[in-house]
Amino acid sequence: MNSNEILQILRQHKAELIKRYDVNHLSLFGSTARNQARANSDIDILVSFNGAATSSRYFGLQFYLEDLLGHPIDLVTEKALRIELRPYIEQEAIRV
């Protein structure tokens, strides 16, 4: 799957993600965003929740996205993003 296909699927399910998991916004980053992903690559997604990133929200969203996209998801919250990686991720991130 390329980045356009993934973004299209995520956009189609955005309302459900907001309703179920109280997502503020999602961004695609990493090898998939750069269209350099291999068949066994995970999909890197940066998420911001409205409110706390509870275990229920975080893991619920991760499992939902894995089922939806059929690939492992590396889900990173904006608050947990390491400061030294932030500029690189923000530069390549594609907002859903």
What are these regions (language model features)?
Residues 46-48:
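Short hydrophobic/aromatic beta-strand micro-patches
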Residues 1-25, 33-39, 50-96:
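Catalytic core of pol beta-like nucleotidyltransferases
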Residues 28:
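Conserved histidines in hydrophobic membrane contexts and catalytic metal-binding motifs
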